[in-house]
Amino acid sequence: MNTRFVRHSYLALLLGLSIFAVSVRLGAEQADSRLFAVVGIASEIAPVEARLEGAIVSRIRGIVFTAGTIDGMRIVTARSGVGKVSASMAATLLLDHFSPSAVIFSGTAGAVDIELNPLDVVIGTGVGYHDYGDVTPEGLVRSPTRDYASGRIDPAFFPAGPDLLAAARKAAKEMKETRVREGLIVTGDAFMASPARRTELRRELNAVAVEMEGAAVAQVCSRFGVPAIVIRSITDRADGSAAQSYAKYRDPAARNAADLAVRTIRELAKSK
C-alpha cells in the first residue's frame, strides 16, 4: 500500500470537510429574510404549530422544531422548556440552525398591572430580568447582564425590535374582540403567586406582566443580532390564586398570544 498516497488522500479529505463545514457555517450566519420564528413552551406554542401547513418536524439536542407555512409565510417554531436556561437553549439552537430574520416569543404571563385581566394580550415593548443582580443586606440590587467575552454590558431591558413592534401594534388593531396592551414584561425563574412581590415589580420596574422565559430569549437574540419581541396573554394576577387561574386560562390565553404573533408576522412579511 502506498502510505504517502493514503496520507495525502486523508489530508485532502479533511481539508475538503473543513471547507464544507466553514461554508455551511457561513451560510447559517446569514439570516433568511423570509423565515420567521416563534418560540414558546410546548403547551403554549401548540396553537401556532397546529396552523402550520406542510409541517416538517426535527429534533436537535432534545428541542423540537417544526417548519412549515401559514398563508404562504415561512415559519419555524421552537418548543422551549420552562425557565430561562431552557429558553436560552432553544433560542440558541434555533438561531444557529435555522437563521430566522426575526423571533417572536409567544405564550402566557401573570399580570403585574392589576388593570390587566385574563385573556388580555401584552406586547412587550421591552423585556428584562427581575431576579438578576446582587443580594445585599438591603435586598436585591438589580443590574444588567454582561457579555464577559467582549466586556459589553447589556441594556437593563432588551427593547423589542422596532419593525416587530410596529408590526405588532398594527396587527393588534385587527383584534377587535381582544384587549391588547403594551409595556415592560419581566422574567424570572419562579412562578409568581405573591401580591406583595407583584406590587414590588410594578412599583420598582413599572412592569405590566411577569413570566419565566422572555428576557432569556431576547438576550440570546441580542447576541446574535436578530430582532425579537415577546407577546404574552394573561392567565392570572400573580397572586394566591395564580396556579388555579393559570390552569383555567392557559389554553385560550395561548391562542390569543399565538393569534397576535401570526398576525404580526403577516404584517412584517408585507415589507419583505
Language-model region placement:
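Bacterial N-terminal signal peptides
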Residues: Y10-A21
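Glycine-rich phosphate- or other oxyanion-binding loops that anchor nucleotides, phosphorylated ligands
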Residues: A31-L35, R59-K272
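N-terminal targeting signals for Sec/Tat export/insertion, comprising classic cleavable signal peptides
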Residues: L35-I63
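N-terminal secretory signal peptides that target proteins for export/translocation
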Residues: M1-V6
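General helical structural elements
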Residues: H8-L11, D236
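Boundary at the C-terminal end of the N-terminal hydrophobic targeting segment
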Residues: L26-E29
